[in-house]
Amino acid sequence: MVKVTGGANKRVSLAALIAIKPGCRPRLIYRVHKNHQRRAMDQRKGFTEADYAQLLDAAHQQLAGPLVVVWDNLNAHVSAAMADLVDARDWLRVYQLPPYAHELNPVEPLWSHLKRSLANLAKRNLAQLTALVKTRLKRMQYRPALIDGFLASIGLDLTPFCNPRN
């Protein structure tokens, strides 16, 4: 999450996954959610279960195959509503990371890299910040070696099943 200074309720929320398909380069698939309005007390600030399900649907469509997802224990990932959405997708299998195991999540180094690239950059409004975040994420999508580095940083070795780069 990246906040806009001077905008008490304005924020850009991000959701991403790194997809690994045998024989192919790793892919970064993401969604950006702008929140520029006041929220009700019972309304979530960022992504809902339905938003995460849409991200998974997009990944399924782009990868043209079943998905095995390893998730952290974010409330939206472990909720009953999310379990129902997962159960409705026969092409999806979900596993949870152990609690407090962020060092096993390859998306965490991605967020760290993104935040470092945004440090000391001032944007005047939510639209400018959103455009910058999307540009940085798009650049990462075209750098498979960088994504490989995120995977390697958690100790995941892809050499046994990922040979050619497609």
Model region roles, listed by residue range:
Residues 1-166:
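Short functional hotspots at interaction and active-site rims
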